[in-house]
Amino acid sequence: MNLLPKSSKEFGSADYWEKFFQQRGKTAFEWYGTYLELCEVLHKYIKPKEKVLVIGCGNSELSEQLYDVGYQDIVNIDISEVVIKQMKERNGSRRPHMSFLKMDMTQLEFPDATFQVVLDKGTLDAVLTDEEEVTLRQVDRMLAEVGRVLQVGGRYLCISLAQAHILKKAVGHFSREGWMVRAHQVASSQDRVSEAEPRFSLPVFAFVMTKFRPVPGSALQIFELCTQEQGKPVRLESADQLAEAVRERQYYAWLCSQLRRKAGLGSVSLDLCSGDTGEPRYTLHVVDNPAVKPSRDNHFAIFIIPQGRETEWLFGMEEGRKQLAASAGFRRLVTVALHRGQRYAGMESIQAELSARVMELAPAGLPPQQQVPFLSVGGDIGVRTVQHQDHSALSGDYVIEDVQGEDRWYFRRLIFLSNRNVVQSEARLLKDTSHRAQKKRKKDRKKQRPADTSEDFPPAPGQSIDKSYLCCEHHKAMVAGLALLRNPELLLETPLTLLVVGLGGGSLPLFVHDHFPKSRIDAVEIDPTMLEVATQWFGFSQSDRMKVHIADGLDYITSLAGEAPPHYDVIMFDVDSKDPTLGMSCPPPAFVDQVFLQKVKSILCHDGVFILNLVCRDVRLKDSVLAGLKAAFPLLYVRRIEGEVNEILFCQLHPEQKLATPELLEMAQVLERTLRKPGQGWDDTYVLSDMLKTVKIV
C-alpha cells in the first residue's frame, strides 16, 4: 500500500489527505519524528501554561503526548474532516480540554494575538510543494495568518525537512518581518528517516521563528543554528549562511545513510569542525575493504594518524589508505587526520571526542554493542610543533612545522596552506644530544615516563639541519642522475656548473653544493620569501659557489639563451605550479613549451643532463609533455617515484650517450664510492644505484 504521495503536488491536495487517512485508519503517522525525538526542542520553546495552535495536526500523537505531560491548552486544526472526526473520537473523553477543529490555515478563524505558540509538524512542507505563483500565494496567506494569531514574543515552531525552496521561503518571510530565526537539527532524526522511511533521507529540522515587535527603520536580522550535539546557538551572518549550514548537515545525513546501506562508495572524506570556532579539527576518510571475510571482530575500526604524518603516502593518498585498510584487516577503516592549529589532549581525549561521530559512519551488519577499536602508530598521537607561520605575496599563507617521524627523528617542513596535504620542502633535524646528558643526570628518579611518551624532546627553533640527508625521494633520484655525466669518479674534482630552478627550502642545491666541492650553482627562485624561509629555517646559505637569483625561471633562461657558449653541465627543474586546475602541478606548462625547451637546450653543455621533476595526473597531458621533451632531447630516461605521482626525467642531447642499465648502475656505484669519503656525512639508506634501477628509456 503506497501511503506516501506519488508526486509532490499531491501534498497540497485535500482529496489526497482524505484518501490518506481513510487508508491508514487509526494508525498514527509520525513521518517527521516522534514525540521522543522532538520533545527536547518542544519543551525548550513551549511553556506548559501557554496557548498552542497546532496547524495540520493530522492523526499524529504529538498533541496527545504534549497534553499528557502538562501542555493542555492546545487547539488542533486540519483541512481533513475524516481526521478531525477520528481525533475527536480518540480524545473526547480522555483529553477534554484539547480541541480539534476543521479549518483552513490560510483563513484562521481566531482573533489577532491569540496564541503564544504555533506548532507545525510537516505542514509547511506539505503545502509548499513547488514555487509556482499559485502555491506561493497560498503559502504567503498561511504565514501571514501565523504571524497574525501569534502574540509578540510568540514562536512559530516549524518541523521541516528544510528543502531549499521551503527554507528560502520561510526564513526569508519571517526575517523580513524582523523575527529571529533559529534552526535546530533534531537528534536521531537522520537515523529514523534513513532506516524507517527510505524515501526521506533528509534530517529533520525544527525552525523557531520568534515574533519581535516591529522597529521602524530597523534592518536587524538574527539567524542562529543549534546542532544536536551543541546546546549553545551559533550566530550566523545571513540567511544564505543558515541555508548552507543546513545543506551541510543534510549532505552528512545522506552520506551516513549511504554508508550504512552499502560499502564501496568510492573515496569518501569529510571534515569535522570545532563547534566553537567552525575551523576544521579532524579530516576523516572512509575506506572499505570488501575482500576481507567478515567476522564479529573485523567489521569496523578507527585509525588515528599521528600529527604531521598525514602527508605520507600510506595516509595521504587513496591507494595508501587502501593498503593500510588491507593490512589492518578490517572491512571498513576510518582514518582520522589531526589539523595543525588545534590542541589535542591525547589519545583518550580524541577517542571520547570522536566516538559518537565515527559510529555514524559504521557499516551495515555491525553487531550490537560491538566494541570498535581505535588504532594508531606507536600508540600515541605524534608531535607537531608549528615554528613559524606567515604569508607570501606569491605563494600565499605558509607554515613551518617540526613533526616527529619514524625512529624518533624530527623533520622540519614547509607547507603552503593552499595545498595542506603536500609537503613543499622537508629536512631532517639533527638530534640534540644536550637533552640526553640532562636525562642521564636524572636517571635515578623513581618516577618513570609513561610507555607511550616520546623520549626525545621536541626540537628548538634554531636546531641544526642534517644537510647530508635528503628527505624527498625525487631529490634523491635527481642527484643520482648526475651519474649520467662522464667520468663520475672525477666529478668531485670537476668544476661542474649547475642551474637549479625552484629553491623551496634549498635542500637540493645545498646537498649538491656540499658534496661536490668544485661545483658552482645558480639557483633561481621567483618568490623572495622562499629565500628567507630557506635561510632562516632550513640551514641554507649563499657562498661564492652558490648564488640565488630572485627571478622568474622563464625570464632567466630566456636571457641566457641569447648568449654564447652553453652555460651549464646540469639543469634541474623543481618548480611547482600555482594553478591546481591544470592537471600538472610541476612544472608550470610554460616550462615544457616547445619554444622554451629549445632555450633550455641552448644553455646545456654538449655532454650535460637536463633533469626535470614532473608531477602530472592527466595522462594525455603527460604524454604530450613527454613527446615535446623527446623532440627537444633525443635521449630521454624516466624514473617513476614509487608511491608518488612524481616522475623524474633525465634528458640528454645525443642518442649515442645512451647507457644500458648495467652500465648506468655501475656508474652510480662509482659516483657513490667517490662521494662516501671520510668526514663527509652520508645517509646509509641512500644508495644511488637503487635510485636508477627502474629507469627506462622513453
From Swiss-Prot:
InterPro entries: Lys/N-term_MeTrsfase_sf, Methyltransf_25, SAM-dependent_MTases_sf. The modification Phosphoserine is found at residue 267. Residues 431-461 are annotated as: Disordered. It catalyses: L-lysyl-[protein] + S-adenosyl-L-methionine = N(6)-methyl-L-lysyl-[protein] + S-adenosyl-L-homocysteine + H(+); N(6)-methyl-L-lysyl-[protein] + S-adenosyl-L-methionine = N(6),N(6)-dimethyl-L-lysyl-[protein] + S-adenosyl-L-homocysteine + H(+); N-terminal glycyl-L-lysyl-L-glutamyl-[protein] + 3 S-adenosyl-L-methionine = N-terminal N,N,N-trimethyl-glycyl-L-lysyl-L-glutamyl-[protein] + 3 S-adenosyl-L-homocysteine + 3 H(+). The lineage of its organism: Eukaryota, Metazoa, Chordata, Craniata, Vertebrata. The modification N-acetylmethionine is found at residue 1. Expressed in the inner ear (at protein level). Expression is detected in the cochlear duct, spiral limbus region, efferent and afferent nerves, and in spiral ganglion neurons (at protein level). It is found in: Cytoplasm; Nucleus; Mitochondrion. GO terms for cellular component: cytoplasm; cytosol; mitochondrion; nucleus. Residues 436-448 have a biased composition (Basic residues). GO terms for biological process: methylation. Belongs to the methyltransferase superfamily. It holds the Pfam family Methyltransf_25. The keyword Phosphoprotein applies. GO terms for molecular function: protein-lysine N-methyltransferase activity. Dual methyltransferase that catalyzes methylation of elongation factor 1-alpha (EEF1A1 and EEF1A2) at two different positions, and is therefore involved in the regulation of mRNA translation. Via its C-terminus, methylates EEF1A1 and EEF1A2 at the N-terminal residue 'Gly-2'. Via its N-terminus dimethylates EEF1A1 and EEF1A2 at residue 'Lys-55'. Has no activity towards core histones H2A, H2B, H3 and H4. The keyword Transferase applies. Its EC number is 2.1.1.-. This is eEF1A lysine and N-terminal methyltransferase. Forms a tripartite complex containing GAB1, METTL13 and SPRY2. Within the complex interacts with GAB1 and SPRY2. Keywords: Acetylation, Cytoplasm, Methyltransferase, Mitochondrion, Multifunctional enzyme, Nucleus, Phosphoprotein, Transferase.
